Regions:
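C-terminal motif of bacterial Sec signal peptides marking the signal peptidase cleavage site
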Residues: 17-21
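Short helix-initiation/N-cap motifs at beta->coil->alpha
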Residues: 68-79, 172-200
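Ligand-binding "clamshell"
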Residues: 99-111, 126-128, 204, 209, ...
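Periplasmic-binding protein-like
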Residues: 154-161, 262-284
Length: 285
């Protein structure tokens, strides 16, 4: 799998587009040789995510340097933490982490909550225009794409249930699969795709559930979504987090990692999230 090493955010803010294209790598431009470097695994960074990590780096100053590795699919960031290729990662919610640990026999842990990113159902397109403007317009026999990894597929199915399109026979804290659908009055065809492909499928399906990670890079406007995930008693499992190895407090980077958490959990970063995500992400600390 192709990895793209990014400059730490001190320099990335100036040239992130170029770096993403050419896969260059570097560390922070800080001149303090005593600074501790912490390697952070992420997925594609939206402008808002870039801005909040820029703010974290600014708060940290020269004490800690953030060095980012950008991954192209969800299967890799946790493996990179487990194999000590990065020190921490920030890309997933609790449900995904718990499921990944079970499937891979690992014990990565959440060390900080960050935000919740409500997923949305988007209309398919035809001739460059949305086919539908509301859920009720989705016709009988329509095809709806959902992510195929267990946790995001489950989340997508619960979203479709909340939107009134299907019913599933399990509770909101259990992983739902297509086999758990107990009611499908419109005879919808639910198509499983890699999460990175759901947005690009909109030209060939009637609707798709798209994770926020891929919304902006696909040129989608979340304000045009047919349905938005609502907060309820089951929302905690969808909180995004910073993850590390279970022995992270014994590592040489422990003090630096704690400073990163403290920097992230400031009103300054909260303000950046609120001002730059335009409602796509909501702080949860």
């Amino acid at each position: 799998m192709k990895l793209k090493k990014l400059f730490s955010l001190a320099t990335a803010a100036l040239s992130v587009g170029v770096l993403a294209a050419c896969g260059s790598s570097s560390s922070s431009s800080s001149s303090d040789s005593s600074a501790t470097t912490v390697r952070v695994g992420v997925m594609s960074l939206s402008d808002s995510e870039q801005a909040r990590w820029d703010k974290v780096q600014k708060i940290l100053g020269d004490e800690v340097k953030l060095e980012f590795t950008q991954f192209t699919d969800y299967s890799q960031p946790n493996k990179a933490v487990a194999e000590n290729e990065v020190d921490i990662n920030a890309f997933q919610h609790y449900n995904f982490l718990n499921n990944w640990n079970q499937e891979n026999g690992e014990d990565l842990v959440a060390i900080a909550d960050t935000y919740i990113a409500p997923i949305r159902l988007y209309s398919g397109t035809a001739d460059g225009k949305n086919k539908y403007t509301k859920v009720e317009e989705i016709p009988d026999g329509a095809e709806i794409a959902v992510p195929n990894d267990p946790t995001n597929e489950s989340r997508a199915l619960y979203l479709l249930q909340a939107a009134g399109l299907i019913k599933v026979g399990v509770s909101g804290t259990e992983l739902a699969t297509i086999a758990d659908i107990t009611e499908n009055k419109k005879n919808l065809k639910i198509t499983e795709l890699d999460a990175s492909q759901t947005a690009s499928s909109l030209s060939s399906v009637d609707a798709a559930v798209v994770n926020n990670t891929f919304v902006l890079e696909a040129g989608l406007d979340y304000k045009n979504a047919l349905y938005k995930e609502q907060k309820d008693e089951n929302s905690k499992q969808w909180y995004n987090l910073i993850a590390a190895r279970s022995d992270w407090e014994k590592s040489e980077q422990v003090a630096a990692i704690k400073k990163i958490i403290e920097a992230y959990h400031t009103d300054e970063v909260k303000k950046v999230i609120e001002e730059t995500s335009d409602g796509m992400d909501e702080p949860v600390w």
